[in-house]
Amino acid sequence: MYKTKIICLLLGILSGLVFAPIFFIPALFTFSYLCYIVQKSQNWQVAAKFGYLFGFGHFLSGMYWISIGVSVYIADFWWAIPFALFGLPIILAFFISANCTLSFFAKNNKYYQLIFCLLWVLFEWIRSWILTGLPWNLIGYAFSFSEILIQPLSITGIYGLSFIVIYISTSAYPVFTKKFTQLKILLASSMLILTVMVIYGAVRVSTNPTNFTDIKVRLVQPSIPQTAKWDQEEFWHNLMLHINLSENLEPTDLIIWSEAALVVPDDIPQVKLKLLNMLNSTNAILITGGISDNKKHGDQFELYSAMYALDKNNNKLFEYHKSHLVPFGEYMPLKNILPFKKLTHGLIDYKEGDGGLVYIKKYHLKIKPLICYESIFPNFVRTNNEIVDVIINITNDAWYGKSSGPYQHFHISRSRAVENGLPMIRVANNGISAIVDPIGRIVKKLNLNEINYIQGLIPQKLTTPTIFSQFGNFAMLLSIVFIILIHYLLSLIFDE
């Protein structure tokens, strides 16, 4: 058993490499071994241990980069690095352990592998909302290396795609049990599903060329190090870097800066003057991330992470407050119990905003605004494209250096465009800034650590809403029923 535990841990680590930026797709078949070893376990306690070790390795290699974010302020948070590196995998591994525990009780069922896959998606869904939720690196994101293979997102959403991916990934498990009839069924159904996916994706990509609106947009990526972002001595240098990248002889309609690009209120006279000079010279509207408050005092004072728009006459065209906050980063959960401060600058916790949509009247542009972490929640983002024209996602991935974190965050965010049939404008302080069309094609992008800007046009949205945007997880359930039906029909053909 000791040897099997080591194998589970190592295969779990390997399985974490299926995500961006490595996309080591052969590692998906580590899940076939997990499916097999759970069925082979002597009792549910053993199955739970195998699942836990696999899960610990999976989340350790897939989410190690969170510890890099903690190390940015190492003088204050050195003690938190091992908790970030090992603590999160220790907690998240329980979801895979629970999946394996329940799957064990179905080990003699003819449809054991299907049950394993259904439970996998169930626990991914639970992980997306329990304790504020962390739907990061859902297994469906392993296919985001291919714009063709992610097209089912428009029907199933990410949870439906996760079911497809975990089904295919466990299709080789009868190799270990030497049940070759079952192997034929699973491989045949997986090949059929993949074929349908490729045909659907290829047709969708080829029949939906990227069309553009007339709205010109400039995405500014200054790549300011996190240690310099809130440094008072660096403030004017940082602001002028933004302005210098924004001012250009080429005309534009919108200039977009990243999350918390303005770390002070925009009504400070010297700051206001610089911004108005820039906007008058470019004749553009600025959309930027910043901080905002409710203008109250004492116990009623509230601070928000905001996205707002300013025109050349100093009119604030909209203001959006982030509603999905990062625990421990933007606020401290259980603050009365835990004697720690949050990672982000300042002693005051951010407060949740109300979410919603915003509008720029001049361009008749209806926007779904997303600040950083909000883009990972598919149901929060889900929007009928009849009432929205574009998703604007501002973020700051400078926390995570050259790790896999910024790449994973980009591909997760990009998936929201496909799900909703909406273009996405994504602007990072450092990370990956891009113009993405409504089927997930990357029109233009800036890579990690680039100091530059993108000039382009906002792509047009699709003319009809996607199935996922209209029906949400109900469409995902229908896709699962479809795959179960394929599995059942092929079992009738191949069963001896």
Curated annotation (Swiss-Prot):
It is found in: Cell inner membrane. It holds the Pfam family LNT_N. Residues 220-464 form the CN hydrolase domain. The chain crosses the membrane at residues 6-26, 50-70, 77-97, 114-134, 148-168, 183-203, 474-494. Keywords: Acyltransferase, Cell inner membrane, Cell membrane, Membrane, Transferase, Transmembrane, Transmembrane helix. Pathway: Protein modification; lipoprotein biosynthesis (N-acyl transfer). It is an enzyme of class 2 (transferase). This is Apolipoprotein N-acyltransferase. It comes from Rickettsia prowazekii (strain Madrid E). The lineage of its organism: Bacteria, Pseudomonadati, Pseudomonadota, Alphaproteobacteria, Rickettsiales. The gene is lnt.
